[in-house]
Design a protein with these regions (language model features):
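Hydrophobic helix-and-loop "lid/oligomerization" segment in the mid-to-C-terminal part
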Residues: 1-183
Length: 183
């Protein structure tokens, strides 16, 4: 049913279609809602019942694509602002005490000590938390820099990062892990 809903010819299916058309449809329900719909589709033996489930998965994936592109556009707008002041004013991270605020400020200053940011850290409050990593990956590809995307989640600010080969993001984040609620 998922093959037909995506208008694919089952006789000409290739790895590309599985990895970049069908797979993302199955994955979208888990990203945006619950993986239950994908599981129900896999277990459904009645084709007539499977078609609406497949259509819903395709719709969720289409929504995920639109939300991802909107997040990427928002991130690019933030990065391409004219002045550093405009850029830094968009980020409002709350920390619990003055010592952490000072350490956080020093860490940001160190990362941005020259004209070019070494690591891009973006706060996109309206970004769906499950899309932060995809958006970070797209920004990393575009700017060739390690990127962290932060967004609002139920338990506070949550983030996802994507790095480049020349930068050990895990090591750098580990060095300041006491600044995070979870790491």
């Amino acid at each position: 049913a998922l093959i037909e809903v995506n208008k694919l010819d089952r006789r000409k299916l290739e790895a590309y279609h599985i990895g970049f058309v069908l797979g993302p449809c199955v994955n979208a329900s888990g990203r945006l809602e619950s993986a239950a719909l994908s599981l129900k589709l896999w277990l459904e033996e009645d084709y007539r019942k499977a078609v609406p489930m497949a259509a819903e998965l395709k719709s969720l994936n289409d929504s995920r694509k639109e939300m991802t592109e909107a997040g990427v556009r928002q991130a690019v707008r933030l990065l391409e602002r004219e002045t550093e002041k405009e850029y830094t004013d968009t980020v409002n991270v709350q920390v619990s005490d003055t010592e952490n605020q000072e350490r956080q400020k020093n860490a940001v200053e160190e990362l941005s000590s020259d004209k070019q940011d070494k690591v891009l850290i973006l706060y996109l409050p309206d970004c769906h938390e499950s899309l932060a990593g995809i958006i970070a990956g797209r920004i990393r590809e575009r700017y060739h820099k390690p990127t962290i995307v932060l967004t609002d989640a139920e338990e506070g600010v949550k983030g996802s990062g994507r790095s480049i080969e020349a930068y050990d993001m895990f090591a750098h984040l580990s060095a300041c892990k006491d600044l995070f609620d979870k790491f």
